[in-house]
Structure formats: C-alpha cells, structure tokens
C-alpha cells in the first residue's frame, strides 16, 4: 500500500422520484469524483446499476482501510451480507424495512464483527440530514465524522529548520534510531512519531505495534496504547494516518480502477 492512500466504501442514496430510496454500495479512492461519475452514467465511468437513475447522493462513507483489498472485501460483504460467514447473525431484510435502513443495520453489525472491528476506520456522514444512530454503535476507537473528507495535506518539510533559510546544507548523515529497538531507521521506512508536543518518539511500525499489543497477546493489529515516550494515550489509527500524511505522494495518475468486477459481467 502506498502512503497517503484513501480507500473508502460508500453508500449512495437515489433522489430520483421514480427510484427514490434505492441505494448502492461502492468502493472509491476519490469520493467527489466518484459521485460525479455515478450521476454521469456509464459513459462517465458510473456503475451500470446507477446509470440513468440519478441523481444520486453519497450520504455515507467508511474510510481508513489499510489497503484497497481490505476495502473491497468490506464492500463485497456489505453488498452480500447473506453470503458472508461473518454476518450470518444479521438476518435478511425485514418486511417493511426500508433498503436504506437495512444497509445501515448491516453496517452496524459489520463494524462490530471481525476482522473489521479492529481496523482504524472512520464512519463519515457526508449528508448530516441522513444521519441515523447505528445499533449496535461503532466501537469506541472508530470516530464519527461529518462533511467531506479533509483534503490531503502536502508532505511536511521534515528536515526544514533555521539553517534552511540561512543557506546552509542540511546534515546528510543523521543517524535516526528507533526509540524502542535502537536500530537505525532506514530511508525507505516511515517511522511512527508521537504527535504530542515535546515527545521525541520515533519507532518502527512493528516495534510500536508489539509494544501496544503486550496487553492483547492474541491480536495482530493494535487499537490504542500509551506512548512509551510521554505516556499519553494514542490511537493506532491516528498514528498510521499521520505517518501517511507525512509521506504522501500524488496518485492521480495511478488511481485504482473503481468499477466493481461484477459490473464487467454486464457489458
């Protein structure tokens, strides 16, 4: 996975009076562009299930997946809950239950089921007027957000300092070491850094994960833990997000194909 990638699984709601209430679940790396494609039809890159039935509104998106594969698996399970062994307890759509309400019910159980329950996901309502409380509610480490995803920030000048403006050459051979294992951090590695002011923690992802998982030896992915440096509480998802923001690259030319593979069967 490239640093700074955005992988989201969204819920569309149809506003067309002839098809009002229909929904569509999809995957995207660019929410704003994707909803334009849906409303533009197949010729603009929209899905065949949404083509000619617009306008569509993207009302909800779940993001923070560690990879495109993880997001696509989440998308598939949300689309086919009866076929997912993780969601056999959810049950079918009830008589009189709106399609939108059913998809929210499925989502609520997905966020509480493994493997998704341990991912650093964010539940974001793009349209606050569509918001409904999920039952059961998301885990405490999954924040609830509103509005469009924040724009991608430019990479920070990690080596910038007073000397940069003075015309001095930056130091080239600085030996930066992991706070936990004391081994050197290689140039190609993106260390995790504590965001709290005054804390100098810089650590390998694996080293900090092992530190956080000491209280949960049976797990592979941490949720949160105390910073070994300043002892402040840290959410694992926040650390990963900050790490990506600091090493982000432009991906407009290498964007993943967003059309679901099942759509290809209809062409």
Swiss-Prot record:
Which HAMAP family does this UniProt record tie to the protein?
Answer: Endonuc_su_Slx1 (MF_03100)
Annotated GO CC locations: Slx1-Slx4 complex
Q: What domain of life does the native source organism fall in?
A: Eukaryota
Q: Name one GO biological process term.
A: double-strand break repair via homologous recombination
Q: Where is the composition biased (Pro residues)?
A: 139-157
* Pfam families from the UniProt entry: GIY-YIG, SLX1_C
Q: How does it assemble?
A: Forms a heterodimer with SLX4.
* Positions of SLX1-type zinc fingers: 178-230
Q: Which gene encodes it?
A: SLX1A
Citing just one GO molecular function, the answer is: zinc ion binding
Q: Which InterPro entries match?
A: GIY-YIG_endonuc (IPR000305), GIY-YIG_endonuc_sf (IPR035901), Slx1 (IPR027520), SLX1_C (IPR048749), SLX1_endonuclease (IPR050381), Znf_RING/FYVE/PHD (IPR013083)
- The protein's Enzyme Commission number: 3.1.-.-
Tell me the ranges covered by the GIY-YIG domain, including all copies: 5-90
User: What cofactor does this one take?
Assistant: a divalent metal cation
What is the protein name for this chain? Structure-specific endonuclease subunit SLX1
Swiss-Prot/TrEMBL keywords: DNA damage, DNA recombination, DNA repair, Endonuclease, Hydrolase, Metal-binding, Nuclease, Nucleus, Zinc, Zinc-finger
Top-level class of the enzyme under EC nomenclature: hydrolase
Region annotated Disordered sits at: 139-169
Similarity comment text for this entry: Belongs to the SLX1 family.
Kindly list the places in or outside the cell where this protein is found, as annotated in its UniProt entry.
Answer: Nucleus
Q: What does this protein do?
A: Catalytic subunit of the SLX1-SLX4 structure-specific endonuclease that resolves DNA secondary structures generated during DNA repair and recombination. Has endonuclease activity towards branched DNA substrates, introducing single-strand cuts in duplex DNA close to junctions with ss-DNA. Has a preference for 5'-flap structures, and promotes symmetrical cleavage of static and migrating Holliday junctions (HJs). Resolves HJs by generating two pairs of ligatable, nicked duplex products.
């Amino acid at each position: 996975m490239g640093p700074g990638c955005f992988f989201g699984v969204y819920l569309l709601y149809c506003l067309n009076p002839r098809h009002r209430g229909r929904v569509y679940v999809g995957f995207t790396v660019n929410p704003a562009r994707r909803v334009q494609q849906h409303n533009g039809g197949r010729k603009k890159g929209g899905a065949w299930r949404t083509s000619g039935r617009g306008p569509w509104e993207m009302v909800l998106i779940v993001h923070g997946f560690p990879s495109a594969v993880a997001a696509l698996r989440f998308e598939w399970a949300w689309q086919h809950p009866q076929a997912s062994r993780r969601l056999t307890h959810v049950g079918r759509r009830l008589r009189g239950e709106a399609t939108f309400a059913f998809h929210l019910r499925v989502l609520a159980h997905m966020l509480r089921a493994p493997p998704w329950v341990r991912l650093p996901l964010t539940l974001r309502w793009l349209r606050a007027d569509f918001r409904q409380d999920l039952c059961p509610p998301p885990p405490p480490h999954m924040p609830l957000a509103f509005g469009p995803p924040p724009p991608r920030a430019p990479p920070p000048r990690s080596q910038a300092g007073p000397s940069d403006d003075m015309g001095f050459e930056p130091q080239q051979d600085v030996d930066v070491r992991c706070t936990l294992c004391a081994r050197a951090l290689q140039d190609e590695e993106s260390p995790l850094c504590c965001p709290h002011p005054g804390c100098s923690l810089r650590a390998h992802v694996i080293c900090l994960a092992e530190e956080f998982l000491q209280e949960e030896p049976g797990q592979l992915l941490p949720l949160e833990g105390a910073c070994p440096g300043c002892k402040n509480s840290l959410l694992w998802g926040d650390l990963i997000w900050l790490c990506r923001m600091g090493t982000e690259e432009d991906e407009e030319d290498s964007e993943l194909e967003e059309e679901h593979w099942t759509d290809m069967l209809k062409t």
